[in-house]
């Protein structure tokens, strides 16, 4: 696209007050686009502002506005408090109450950022939405757009974007997707941006400390039993299944601690935490629901790579079944503690194909109700 063409293209740049979105705005401005900076307000009036992490706080909004002034672009603070509470905070707590382990950042990108922001961009007459995600946008000769892993493998964020509506792909830009993080900071320093040395946010933005503390504040305790998955034996007590996640081995509240046990299964209906050995946490496959695909379903390859948690390497898998609602796949090698509620994200090489929410599994060891667990359960395979 020529400079003259870019000058006629308006871009809504999502700004968080961090270095990545700051450099994104600066690069777009340098490239000749008409840039509008915007930050989404998530913090409610009835909450202390320090309960929000640096990427979503009033201080971050102030810094984003100052960066917009440095870059020379207009800046708007957009009110999305209601949507954030409805689509993100509420479901986050609901998932924990149902024994699942949610990833709110995936939900936020899907239902707030790349849904609401694209709508707002169209209202403002913008051709594109841009963010500071480390994702590569690849445009093919036929005009179709693909999302690929960012060039910095340590910062790649495609895992969080599997839910992006396919029709929105052509309207999203990722200017830092082809850069490594140190270079992004260099650019910020060269331009004198005040966020050049700002540390990265590490927490869930609306959880000020530990997730368990946040969950405890909002969900009531329910005392229950911890049982051994193979025998049904009671080996401890707990204060609620919402305080546990699959694979967990510390802080379980077991009567005896000489043997290492992991959380194998959570059953909120009976208020039971099931524990077992490491091998009991191995999954041979998974079922995912709420699927979204960034290509025609007929083009989804049978052999894929799947990533089941952020910052882990993808593993090879075979797609056994896929439709518009979800998919089922088998791992090439069993995987440890695949957690329902997390995302199963599909790739072909560096290309993001789509994903879904992990709903169920195909472990070697079945979960046995307490009234059927008087005898050890034989392990198949």
UniProtKB/Swiss-Prot annotation:
Any one annotated GO CC term: cytoplasm
Residues annotated for ATP binding in this entry: 14-21, 40, 132
Catalysed conversion reaction: S-sulfanyl-L-cysteinyl-[protein] + uridine(34) in tRNA + AH2 + ATP = 2-thiouridine(34) in tRNA + L-cysteinyl-[protein] + A + AMP + diphosphate + H(+)
KW ATP-binding (keyword) present: yes
Family statement drawn from the similarity comment of this UniProt entry: Belongs to the MnmA/TRMU family.
Site (Interaction with tRNA): 133, 342
Protein name: tRNA-specific 2-thiouridylase MnmA
Region (Interaction with tRNA): 155-157, 309-310
Species for this entry: Deinococcus geothermalis (strain DSM 11300 / CIP 105573 / AG-3a)
Recorded GO MF terms: ATP binding; tRNA binding; tRNA-uridine 2-sulfurtransferase activity
Intracellular or extracellular location(s): Cytoplasm
GO biological process: tRNA wobble position uridine thiolation
Record Pfam families: tRNA_Me_trans (PF03054), tRNA_Me_trans_C (PF20258), tRNA_Me_trans_M (PF20259)
Enzyme nomenclature, EC number: 2.8.1.13
Cited function: Catalyzes the 2-thiolation of uridine at the wobble position (U34) of tRNA, leading to the formation of s(2)U34.
Active site per UniProt: 108 (nucleophile), 205 (cysteine persulfide intermediate)
Disulfide bonds: 108-205
InterPro entries associated with the record: MnmA-like, MnmA-like_C, MnmA-like_central, MnmA-like_central_sf, Rossmann-like_a/b/a_fold
Keywords, in A-Z order: ATP-binding, Cytoplasm, Disulfide bond, Nucleotide-binding, RNA-binding, Transferase, tRNA processing, tRNA-binding
Domain of life assignment: Bacteria
